Amino acid sequence: MVLIVALVMAQSPKFVHEVTASYQKQTMHGFTVYVSKAARANPADTDPALDLLRDELAEVVALVPAKALATLRTVPVFIENNNPGFPCAAYHPSKDWLKENGYNLDKARSVEISNPKNFVAWVKLNQPLMVLHEMAHAYHDIKFGFSDPYIGAVYKLAQTSGTYDDVGHNRGGTRRHYGLNNQQEFFAEATEAYFGENDFYPFNRAQLRAHDPKAAEMIEWAWGASG
């Protein structure tokens, strides 16, 4: 067993954090997308991910208030080829963290598609607004900071209410709501529910307003949304 693992590791190329100049730059719906050299060398996984990303960004443009798009479009998207640091996608808020972990510092305040194959599979399986979720992290960070007292207070109310401890999931059954993990995830999950469809209950805007009206008000305040 140890020998098999060693052979697999020996045959798997080590992930390389590329410099920005090695990425191919594209524009999708006003968003800047950087595709790594390694990702371009794996079109079987990367091309479907780029097609899906284009659709997901179009959905972001269609769903969020127009005045928020100026902020979102400052957030670049980096496409990698199976970065083992993240299973699918992530938002990078901290240049210090990037430096400590050997990442390209230009990824500060960017969204990274770390694993194109998982990105396509997971979006199609049950996370239709994954890109909006990651962009919500960026918006939260850039506009308010992750220590915003108002967002934090609404999160704390949800956390202590018990109403998110055991909720429906779009794959069936009930689970602890992912938004309970921290203020950032609570904001991103509520954003998905308000503007489209989330994988945890409350799944949509009407349910969010009924289940947690303060969270709905928070989203309307943050994004300048109404209706």
Residue ranges and their predicted role:
Residues 3-11:
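Hydrophobic h-region of N-terminal signal peptides that target proteins for export
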Residues 11-25:
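Short acidic, Pro/Gly- and aromatic-enriched capping/linker segments at domain boundaries
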Residues 23-27, 66-69:
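Short secondary-structure boundary/capping segments within folded domains
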Residues 36, 50-160, 216:
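Acidic/His-rich structured neighborhood in mature extracellular/periplasmic domains
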Residues 42-53, 124-132, 144, 177-184, ...:
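Solvent-exposed, acidic/flexible segments
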Residues 43, 146-150, 202:
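Residues in and immediately flanking transmembrane alpha helices
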